[in-house]
Curated annotation (Swiss-Prot):
GO BP annotation list: adaptive immune response; B cell homeostasis; cell surface receptor signaling pathway; hematopoietic progenitor cell differentiation; negative regulation of B cell proliferation
GO terms, molecular function: signaling receptor activity
Annotated phenotype, changing H56N: Found in a renal cell carcinoma sample; somatic mutation
Keywords of the record: Adaptive immunity, Disease variant, Disulfide bond, Glycoprotein, Immunity, Membrane, Receptor, Repeat, Signal-anchor, Transmembrane, Transmembrane helix
Lineage of source species: Eukaryota, Metazoa, Chordata, Craniata, Vertebrata
Topology in the lipid bilayer: Single-pass type III membrane protein
Tissue specificity annotation: Highly expressed in spleen, thymus, small intestine and peripheral blood leukocytes. Expressed in resting B-cells and activated T-cells, but not in resting T-cells.
Residue pairs linked by disulfide bridges in the UniProt entry: C34-C47, C50-C62, C54-C66, C71-C86, C89-C100, C93-C104
Protein name: Tumor necrosis factor receptor superfamily member 13B
Protein function: Receptor for TNFSF13/APRIL and TNFSF13B/TALL1/BAFF/BLYS that binds both ligands with similar high affinity. Mediates calcineurin-dependent activation of NF-AT, as well as activation of NF-kappa-B and AP-1. Involved in the stimulation of B- and T-cell function and the regulation of humoral immunity.
Gene that this polypeptide is encoded by: TNFRSF13B
TNFR-Cys repeat windows: 33-67, 70-104
Matching PROSITE patterns: TNFR_NGFR_1 (PS00652)
InterPro entries hit by this protein: TACI_Cys-rich-dom, TNFR_13B
Length: 293
């Protein structure tokens, strides 16, 4: 009796346990104890990896894990466990989680691969940065007196050509003025001084003596009169020289009218006065070998 009672009690206990905890609940409790990437196998009574059944078309136990595994294999996507969906990283770059950090950093470096939204956002940031930098440079230029030009002022090609051509003309004008000044300086330095009196041409002694004789023979206020010349006029005017002592008859001095007689030894002897007449006589020494010899 006791055994039957025990068996009944045991049977009741098992039945009660089965009623209280059906088979599905037991498996659920077992699956709860398994990690996320594993599932509970009721036949083997242990946790198995979900990777072995992800390739099958119909999987119920590891559906979430298999979906996350396939999402990780795709580049630029990650699996959101809250939404239980695969999300592209390109649509959330800038506010991306750590799973999309590598993808978003590479995409930001190459703006060609960015989506249009990110391109617009980035272009707007670049424009804002350029405006801020332009304003900063404008403040610097306004603060400095040396460069009063407006910020962002750009000259066209025609204006640049006009500026350079004007500078070239100014440089040419300065160079021409310098060359003209140098030429005038060299010319002035090479010319003699105009203040110095010009030297008179020297006359031959014969011509000068003849001029003096003509001036002496003719009065100053009257016109010049004809003059005769002779070789041996007034022999008493001749000065004795060594040649005349040896060979007489070869006189050498010059006698000009009423002027003194000049010899080779530069001795002056008075000539006799000639009575006033219409003709003035000028004595010229005879040359050796001439008709007077």
């Amino acid at each position: 009796m006791s055994g039957l009672g025990r068996s009944r009690r045991g049977g009741r206990s098992r039945v009660d346990q089965e009623e209280r905890f059906p088979q599905g609940l037991w498996t659920g409790v077992a699956m709860r104890s398994c990690p996320e990437e594993q599932y509970w196998d009721p036949l083997l009574g242990t946790c198995m990896s979900c990777k072995t059944i992800c390739n099958h078309q119909s999987q119920r136990t590891c559906a979430a894990f298999c979906r996350s595994l396939s999402c990780r294999k795709e580049q630029g996507k990650f699996y959101d466990h809250l939404l239980r969906d695969c999300i592209s990283c390109a649509s959330i770059c800038g506010q991306h989680p750590k799973q999309c950090a590598y993808f978003c950093e590479n995409k930001l470096r190459s703006p060609v691969n960015l989506p249009p939204e990110l391109r617009r956002q980035r272009s707007g940031e670049v424009e804002n940065n350029s405006d801020n930098s332009g304003r900063y440079q404008g403040l610097e230029h306004r603060g400095s007196e040396a460069s009063p030009a407006l910020p962002g002022l750009k000259l066209s090609a025609d204006q640049v050509a006009l500026v350079y051509s004007t500078l070239g003309l100014c440089l040419c004008a300065v160079l021409c003025c310098f060359l003209v000044a140098v030429a005038c300086f060299l010319k002035k330095r090479g010319d003699p001084c105009s203040c110095q009196p010009r030297s008179r041409p020297r006359q031959s002694p014969a011509k000068s003596s003849q001029d003096h004789a003509m001036e002496a023979g003719s009065p100053v206020s009257t016109s010049p009169e004809p003059v005769e010349t002779c070789s041996f006029c007034f022999p008493e005017c001749r000065a004795p020289t060594q040649e005349s002592a040896v060979t007489p008859g070869t006189p050498d001095p010059t006698c000009a009218g009423r002027w003194g007689c000049h010899t080779r030894t530069t001795v002056l002897q008075p000539c006799p006065h000639i009575p006033d007449s219409g003709l003035g006589i000028v004595c010229v020494p005879a040359q050796e070998g001439g008709p007077g010899a």
